[in-house]
Amino acid sequence: DIDIESKHDYRKIAIELEELLCRNIQFRLYTTMALDNLEDILSNFINKDFSSIDVLIKYDSSITPKDYLLLAKKYPSVSFVVHTSPLSSFHESLLKDVYPIVGYVQFIKQEIFSSDCCGIINNCSMVHPNNVHDYMEGVLRNKCLNKKISIDTKGNIKNCPSMKHIYGNIKHSSLIDVCKNKSFRSYWYLNKEKIKICKDCEYRNVCNDCRAFIKNKYEKPLKCNYNPYNLSWDNEKQT
């Protein structure tokens, strides 16, 4: 996560994530950023073995969809989602015939101002598996936290930026050492069968879950609006 006060060592982060065999990276920027500064960050992650780099960034009227598309063309693993936009739109990758999954630019109206804007679970947030491996991950592991490691705006290392427990700070701690921590890894194995109410839900194996906004570790997510006992969604909470 990145805000106006963040001062991350992106080179160190890129090296350690590659050593951990990380394949997918997401940057969440709660502020605008000039393209030159954004490129300075991305340059640390290029020519490394990352399959996709998703950049969630705040809308800036001076930066056009074409500007983002050209930057994504320069760094083919990168895609952009521009939040807090006045209009919604989707723009296909300039390299879609070569890299059909990445390189796109999407503008969304949703305001994302902090990590508190995460964790909403509704009937639009379910992720249906693409294959047996994806399905079994939902059965055996936690869909949100399995093999995930995060750095919040202050550099604190967590399972998720929205969670409270801190395992160190990237300024003086290693992502590799944190991944060896049994307490950190325990959340990877917290599947839906161990969570109250969720274990009875028919969506449990396709739900992304959330362990940040909860009363305790084994409770249903507070931002989930589904009742599996009467098969109903509370539509008022879905927005």
Regions found by a protein language model. Name each.
Residues 1-11, 17-36, 50-62, 78-87:
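Core AdoMet radical
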Residues 164-239:
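Flexible mid-to-C-terminal extensions adjoining Fe-S/redox cofactors in radical SAM and related proteins
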Residues 20, 54-56, 79-83, 111, ...:
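A broadly tuned preference for mixed-charge, low-complexity surface segments
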Residues 74-160, 206:
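A C-terminal junction/extension of Radical SAM enzymes
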Residues 12-18, 38-47, 66-75, 93-98:
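Short, aromatic/basic amphipathic alpha-helical patches
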Residues 1, 160, 216:
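Canonical Radical SAM [4Fe-4S] cluster-binding loop centered on the CxxxCxxC motif
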